[in-house]
Amino acid sequence: MKTGIHPEYRPVVFVDTSTDFKFLSGSTKSSSETIKWEDGNEYPLLRVEISSDSHPFYTGKQKHATADGRVDRFNKKYGLK
């Protein structure tokens, strides 16, 4: 890789603003806010609106589409099935 053209990859703390869940991960994103983490070090803080802690897919609260779709409406309208 060429030197000087890639962004700096460093540890960053992400905080889910809807659940206040925090996790440490690597990122190239920069931030002016910092937070003291559990290990005693200070890391940049990035706020996210949704994470694996609040996303319906991961929490099990995902809504499934009902069977009342376009095909079912067509079948009801024309008396099929």
Swiss-Prot record:
Q: Biological process GO annotation list?
A: translation
Lineage, top-rank taxon, reads: Bacteria
Q: Which GO terms describe its cellular component?
A: ribonucleoprotein complex; ribosome
Sorted alphabetically, the keyword list is: Ribonucleoprotein, Ribosomal protein
Looking up Gene3D superfamilies in the UniProt record yields: Ribosomal protein L31
Q: Which HAMAP family match?
A: Ribosomal_bL31_2
Q: Which family does it belong to?
A: Belongs to the bacterial ribosomal protein bL31 family. Type B subfamily.
Record-given protein name: Large ribosomal subunit protein bL31B
Lineage start: Bacteria, Bacillati, Bacillota, Bacilli, Bacillales
In the UniProt record, what gene is named as encoding this protein? rpmE2
